[in-house]
Amino acid sequence: MRKMSFASKSLVLLLSIFAARGADKNAPFKPGPTESYPCRQTQEKVTVAVQPFDTEEKTRLAFDKLDPNRYGVLPVLVIIRNDGPSTLMLDGLRVEYLTESRQKVEAIPSREVAKVNAPGRPHISGGPLPTQIPRSSTKKNPLTNWTIEGRAFAAKALPSGESASGFFYFEARHRSGAALYLTGLREAPSRRELFYFEIPLDAALDGR
């Protein structure tokens, strides 16, 4: 019998969460623990796990019928677990998507995601975006869906022993060889900045 890869097991876990939510459409999206994701890294007792939501099957878990990828927006789930002794300050957290060619794509503030679908806005992508991206007025723009801002990463501080999670959004198409780059995590008492996190995302592709 062929064994399932860790990434495949993670996708099954995500799908089981979605199935459990099926009976209650208003139930909040709840990601799994950091150790359930294959793309993760631990430094100084802080673990960061990430999961690109690059398929319709995955986006349905958090955004229901909306697939932001259809409109040129890649959602990436970020979970941060603080097992250190001090509270972490996240107000200066910076998250960038590194393409396979090492091009840095900055995260789009959640309140500005809808502008990606506005006519005339230049694209900054990690590879060709899907052709014939739907264009619509702001009023009917599907990216104005409440889930975009409602699911966004919003934590500004993270006490010891706790986790925080949410989505960051990038104008990019997910491809093999990409990574997520995080900087700006600081210890609250000293304001000392932790070492950066660079997390390869290829393990997530194995779970498709």
PLM feature spans:
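Hydrophobic h-region of N-terminal signal peptides that target proteins for export
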Residues: 13-22
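Bacterial N-terminal signal peptides that target proteins for export
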Residues: 1-11
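Conserved functional micro-motifs across diverse proteins
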Residues: 22-208
